UniProtKB/Swiss-Prot annotation:
GO terms for biological process: neuropeptide signaling pathway. The gene is GAL. PANTHER family: GALANIN, GALANIN PEPTIDES. This is Galanin. GO terms for cellular component: extracellular space; secretory granule. The keyword Secreted applies. The modification Alanine amide is found at A29. InterPro entries: Galanin (IPR008174), Galanin_pre (IPR008175). Keywords: Amidation, Hormone, Neuropeptide, Secreted. One of its GO terms (molecular function) is neuropeptide hormone activity.
Length: 29
């Protein structure tokens, strides 16, 4: 989604891993 794209661009590769963990914990993935 745009979140991964924006976060990946602004924060770097680690942001994508953080988003994955976030969605995984909340069951949104």
């Amino acid at each position: 989604g745009w979140t991964l794209n924006s976060a990946g661009y602004l924060l770097g590769p680690h942001a994508i891993d953080n988003h994955r963990s976030f969605h995984d914990k909340h069951g949104l993935a």
